[in-house]
UniProtKB/Swiss-Prot annotation:
GO cellular component entries: cytoplasm
Record carries keyword Nucleus: no
One Gene Ontology term of the molecular function aspect: rRNA (cytosine-N4-)-methyltransferase activity
EC numbers on record: 2.1.1.199
Broad class of enzyme this protein falls into: transferase
Major subcellular location class: cytoplasm
Gene3D superfamilies attached to this UniProt entry: Putative methyltransferase TM0872, insert domain, Vaccinia Virus protein VP39
Locations listed in the record: Cytoplasm
Organism for this UniProt entry: Tropheryma whipplei (strain Twist) (Whipple's bacillus)
Top-level taxon of origin: Bacteria
Family: Belongs to the methyltransferase superfamily. RsmH family.
The name this protein goes by in its record: Ribosomal RNA small subunit methyltransferase H
Length: 317
């Protein structure tokens, strides 16, 4: 029904299916077209899905795709950091975050995500949001643009690109993705980098437009707090900025916190799982090249907060 293939579907199901029972709630916080959730609903009979997406078009596709499970699904049009508003004190057994762009978003030039196809400078996941890439590129100061390109795109030519954008917009407003893509291509030495020179800048703009990294940290912290004992959080990230947030947060909750100068025995509330499932197989990458940058991380809650309370132990003699 659409060209989007769920990334690392087998690995995701391998982590999620064993812990989902009848009546258990799982949150697909980035529902997209519903590919992951469809597989999980098929194999985990009796589990209840809360599917969340800020993209109304994607949500409509998922609703249609999952119509056979309508009695077990609730669909929410919102950003994924707001999932707790809809749970009515429920504690989910599973959270899934697939942070990648869907093919249907990238391949539709009218959405403005692609640097390969001409379209409006939009990049909004939720098309009712106010800020667009056009407003950022034509309205932000040169200093602000440099910060965005460096922080969110890790772009080594951030200063050069921002300067050229400000120069170009002083002549006429930047309107299309191809304008910006060509401007970046003209500024950056082609022999220095692999791939398209606009890739990092477009990533940075998309993150800024949609506040992606801020929402991610907030959502993961809420998920860690609400997750049932025995439940799991599974995250697919696609660039180092996302993965760094996930990695550091998961590591921090899966090790004992030992204050300096105290003898304390405290079992961590979470443990890292799925370390052998981090990256897609070569066969999947061959069939779906967009999966090549995927990175899978997961944690399982092994204790409640009260069970993991610190205990003072005697120092060694």
């Amino acid at each position: 029904m659409n060209g989007h293939l769920p990334v690392m579907l087998g690995e995701v199901c391998q982590l999620i299916e064993p812990v989902l029972g009848i009546g258990d709630v799982f949150i697909d916080a980035t529902l997209g077209a519903g590919g992951h959730s469809e597989a999980i609903l098929m194999s985990s009979q009796g589990a209840l899905l809360y599917g969340i997406d800020r993209d109304a078009y994607a949500l409509a596709l998922a609703r249609k795709r999952l119509s056979g499970f309508a009695d077990r699904c609730k669909f929410v049009h919102d950003t994924f950091d707001k999932f707790d508003k809809y749970l009515s004190n429920l504690h989910p057994k599973v959270f899934l975050f697939d942070l990648g762009m869907s093919s249907m978003q990238i391949d539709n030039p009218d959405r403005g995500f692609s640097y390969m196809k001409s379209g409006p400078l939009d990049m909004r996941m939720n098309e009712s949001d106010k800020i667009t890439a056009k407003e950022i590129l034509n309205g932000y100061s040169e200093t602000a643009l440099i910060r965005i390109f460096r922080d969110y795109g890790q772009e080594r030519y951030a200063k050069r690109i921002a300067r050229q954008i400000c120069k170009a917009r002083s002549v006429s407003e930047l309107v299309t993705t191809c304008q910006v893509s060509q401007l970046i291509r003209d500024v950056c030495p082609p022999h220095i980098r692999k791939g398209h020179p606009a890739k990092r800048v477009f990533q940075a703009l998309r993150i800024e437009v949609n506040s992606e990294l801020l929402f991610l940290r907030t959502a993961l912290e809420k998920a860690l707090d609400l997750l049932q004992v025995g439940g799991r959080i599974v995250v697919l990230s696609y660039h180092s900025l996302e993965d760094r947030i996930v990695k550091h947060l998961f590591r921090s909750v899966s090790v004992s916190q030992l204050p300096k100068g105290f003898y304390i025995n405290k079992d961590p509330e979470y443990k890292l799982i799925g370390k052998d499932l981090k990256n897609p197989k070569e066969t999947e990458i061959a069939n779906n090249p967009r999966a090549s940058s995927a990175h899978l991380r997961a944690v399982e809650r092994v204790h409640s907060h009260s069970q993991a309370e610190a205990q003072i132990v005697e120092p060694r003699a």
